[in-house]
UniProtKB/Swiss-Prot annotation:
Known partners and oligomeric status: Heterotrimer composed of a catalytic subunit and a homodimer of accessory subunits.
Organism lineage string: Eukaryota, Metazoa, Chordata, Craniata, Vertebrata
Transit peptide extent on chain: 1-44
Main location: mitochondrion
Highest taxon above the source species: Eukaryota
Pfam families named in the record: HGTP_anticodon
Native source species: Xenopus laevis (African clawed frog)
Alphabetical keyword list: DNA replication, DNA-binding, Mitochondrion, Transit peptide
SUPFAM superfamilies: Class II aaRS ABD-related (SSF52954), Class II aaRS and biotin synthetases (SSF55681)
Function (record text): Mitochondrial polymerase processivity subunit. It regulates the polymerase and exonuclease activities promoting processive DNA synthesis. Binds to ss-DNA.
Keyword Mitochondrion annotated: yes
GO terms for biological process, alphabetical: mitochondrial DNA replication
Sample GO molecular function, one term: DNA binding
Annotated protein name in UniProt: DNA polymerase subunit gamma-2, mitochondrial
PANTHER family: DNA POLYMERASE SUBUNIT GAMMA-2, MITOCHONDRIAL, GLYCYL-TRNA SYNTHETASE/DNA POLYMERASE SUBUNIT GAMMA-2
Length: 463
């Protein structure tokens, strides 16, 4: 049989199906978790929620938080979109907050970083994504290709669907580092991949691939305390998600049970189009470790006081890309803008939490000698950047509108403060600082602006 690009794709589909059948017995707990995360029912409501959804998608594209040919709730949830510059900064801030909360501020959690591809299918999804070189397949003789198709699982690597596998693999060396003392956790943030449901791939040979950034904590504790730890981490994680929200009630928790009666907890957010799972917590007892390390009971034992036992696993897995969507949806508010020619209208404000807002300060200049004002703006921006403050250089823009148009644009970008340098700044050192949340304008001396803004941002992080 002559291999072409088309029939090579068909052969890959056949191989994937064969691998899927051979892996059906593996990791039912992981498959149950996956079903909880990706198969939620969505029904778009009409009226205000539908309007908010349209406004949200338009704003995210207009202000470059998200990008893609067409943004829909399905494409966003399935991970088929890109992040624009502001989305990247928002994500970077969210990742930093997660890492600080789970790793930096705790004594018993270690960070790890594992490979994107798996060498064993023990935690592969029901329809695994295989890492295959099609050129190599096309060069294989027919007899070798047939032999490969008969048993592909042992000769391939799989793109990871979850981060659990890497943590279980790193359990033994990490336990040795901690002198085999429990409890402890392994945390990781990384990309994971999944196939798009078949109804989205009609007319195509190979399935589309979606991706998401997953934040995972795998917690190892004694069997007798694993249930308490699961409850503890559920409280911690729900409080963490609610901490940065304008409306904390948008995040909620629901408990479910798998076929074996084991409890899992879902942290969900109420989007305009329906409820979606943001994070999942489940107690996997000791079966996950035994599946990863068969026949190694002694090697898996850790110290629980004077006893040595195989720990139970509590797994926390969060989708940070959905978290970004949740906070964008939560932050979007409509306020009444000042009247223009006697007409009032609504304008959008993105009230992101100060620690998550991608741009903290925008520096602009008003009327006056352009060259001198630009030098003041550049100096102030440099001072703020040295303090780790992300500054938007509005003074470099060549197209200038009214101040209200400027404030409207920055409100949609979620900018916390707008600093306006004007001719009076050159005369007496005073400039104007406008707050996104209150719309109040305060006059501050240029020498005190940096300390004022840095203190505010630092204080917001401690709320």
């Amino acid at each position: 049989m002559l291999l072409t690009l088309k029939n090579t794709g068909q052969l890959l589909v056949a191989a994937c199906s064969k691998v899927a059948r051979s892996l059906a017995k593996y990791h039912p707990r992981v498959n149950h978790h996956r079903h909880c995360v990706w198969c939620s029912k969505r029904g778009l409501t009409t009226g205000g929620t539908a309007q908010k959804q349209d406004i949200l998608f338009h704003l995210c594209q207009q202000r470059h938080f998200l990008s893609g040919e067409t943004l829909t709730c399905t494409s966003l949830v399935q991970g088929c979109h890109n992040l624009g510059p502001l989305g990247v900064e928002l994500k970077r801030n969210l990742v930093a907050q997660w890492w600080n909360s789970v790793v930096v501020y705790r004594e018993q959690v270690l960070g790890i970083d594992t490979l994107h591809h798996l060498s064993t299918p023990s935690s592969a999804p029901e329809k695994p994504l295989l890492a295959i070189c099609t050129q190599h397949l096309k060069e294989l003789p027919r007899d070798q290709l047939v032999k490969w198709l008969e048993d592909p699982a042992g000769k391939l690597e799989f793109l990871r669907h979850e981060l659990l596998y890497g943590a279980l693999l790193e359990y033994v060396p990490s336990m040795e580092l901690l002198n085999k003392k429990m409890p402890f956790g392994l945390a990781e943030i990384g990309k994971c991949f999944h196939s798009i449901p078949e109804e989205r791939n009609k007319g195509t040979i190979l399935p589309r691939i979606g991706e998401r950034t997953v934040a995972s904590l795998v917690w190892f504790s004694s069997p007798k305390s694993s249930g308490q730890w699961q409850d503890y981490w559920l409280r911690q994680r729900l409080q963490w998600w609610q901490k940065f929200a304008q409306s904390p009630s948008g995040f909620s928790c629901n408990d479910i049970q798998d076929g074996q009666g084991r409890k899992s907890s879902l942290i969900q957010y109420e989007f305009p189009w329906g409820r979606e799972t943001i994070e999942t917590l489940c107690n996997m007892d000791d079966s996950a470790l035994f599946q990863m390390h068969p026949g190694c009971t002694t090697k898996l034992q850790a110290r629980d006081g004077r006893k040595s036992v195989v720990p139970h696993v509590v797994w926390v897995s969060g989708d940070l890309d959905r978290g970004i969507l949740a906070y964008l949806s939560d932050a979007l508010q409509q306020t009444e803008a000042p009247a223009v020619r006697g007409q009032y209208h609504q304008r959008e404000v993105l009230k992101l939490h100060p620690t998550l807002a991608p741009i903290k300060v925008a520096v602009d200049m008003g009327k006056g000698p352009t060259g001198e004002l630009r030098l003041v703006c550049q100096g102030l921006s440099s001072e703020l950047r040295e303090q780790g403050v992300y500054v938007w250089p509005g003074y470099q823009e060549t197209l200038h509108g009214s101040l209200e148009q400027l404030y409207t644009k920055y409100d949609k970008m979620g900018v916390l403060f707008t600093v306006l340098v004007s001719e009076s700044t050159l005369e007496n050192g005073l400039l104007q600082v406008r707050s996104r949340d209150t719309t109040l304008k305060e006059t501050i001396h240029v020498s005190k602006v940096k300390d004022f803004l840095v203190r505010y941002i630092a204080a917001a992080g401690n709320l």
